[in-house]
């Protein structure tokens, strides 16, 4: 029997937007601001599942495959910091309804399948920096990245040789 894996559902960023965000982050945040999230690990988490058995992963994948949700456009136009969790994030002022619906469906399915789900409201974001123990200056509004979201992904998270790696396991297309 295989070992449980640490899993989550997420939305990827297109490579060109990921590169622009990395450049923007390097321009606006000094190295001491926090530990930058690796470019390949930038994503928007929809539902964190925790440690999941192969059997539960299969069941969650079947449920995810039944979702019929239209695609939507994400506009990343907001940033902030959560001091308690020591995170600097990039997000959106007005999350699209489709994003909220997709996250709610996945979180609800996860909870019904026995995966703990936080009772805190969903705050869609992309983590830019971790271990940001001091308050940082957030760049003024004016940045804006938009892209069409056409799929979501199930990821496995692993830690080896001092690095976190997110491996895509399966993708599902959103309807047109």
Curated annotation (Swiss-Prot):
GO terms, molecular function: 2',3'-cyclic-nucleotide 3'-phosphodiesterase activity; RNA 2',3'-cyclic 3'-phosphodiesterase activity
Reactions it catalyzes: a 3'-end 2',3'-cyclophospho-ribonucleotide-RNA + H2O = a 3'-end 2'-phospho-ribonucleotide-RNA + H(+)
InterPro entries membership: Cyclic_Pdiesterase, RNA_CPDase
Short motif (HXTX 1): ranges: 43-46
Pfam families in the record: 2_5_RNA_ligase2 (PF13563)
Keyword Zinc-finger on entry: no
Catalytic residues as annotated in Swiss-Prot or TrEMBL: 43, 125
Top enzyme category: hydrolase
Outcome of gene disruption: Disruption abolishes ligase activity in cell lysates, but mutants grow normally under laboratory conditions.
EC number(s) on file: 3.1.4.58
Keyword annotations from UniProtKB, A to Z: Hydrolase
Record motif HXTX 2, residues: 125-128
Primary role: Hydrolyzes RNA 2',3'-cyclic phosphodiester to an RNA 2'-phosphomonoester. In vitro, can also ligate 5' and 3' half-tRNA molecules with 2',3'-cyclic phosphate and 5'-hydroxyl termini, respectively, to the product containing the 2'-5' phosphodiester linkage. This reaction does not require ATP and is reversible.
Subunit structure: Monomer.
Family the UniProt entry places it in: Belongs to the 2H phosphoesterase superfamily. ThpR family.
Name of this chain's protein: RNA 2',3'-cyclic phosphodiesterase
Organism: Escherichia coli (strain K12)
Gene for this chain: thpR
């Amino acid at each position: 029997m295989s070992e449980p894996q640490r899993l989550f559902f997420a939305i990827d960023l297109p490579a060109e937007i990921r590169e622009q965000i990395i450049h923007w982050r390097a321009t606006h945040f000094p190295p001491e601001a926090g530990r930058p999230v690796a470019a390949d690990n930038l994503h928007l988490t929809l539902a964190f599942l925790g440690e999941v058995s192969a059997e539960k992963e299969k069941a969650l994948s079947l449920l995810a495959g039944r979702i019929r949700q239209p695609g939507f456009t994400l506009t990343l136009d907001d940033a902030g910091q959560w001091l308690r969790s020591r995170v600097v994030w990039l997000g959106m002022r007005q999350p699209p309804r489709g994003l909220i619906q997709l996250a709610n469906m996945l979180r609800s399915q996860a909870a019904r399948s026995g995966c703990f789900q936080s009772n805190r409201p969903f705050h869609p974001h992309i983590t830019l920096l971790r271990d940001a123990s001091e308050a940082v200056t957030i760049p003024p509004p004016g940045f804006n990245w938009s892209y069409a979201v056409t799929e979501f992904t199930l990821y496995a998270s692993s830690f080896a040789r001092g690095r976190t790696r997110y491996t895509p396991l399966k993708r599902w297309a959103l309807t047109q």
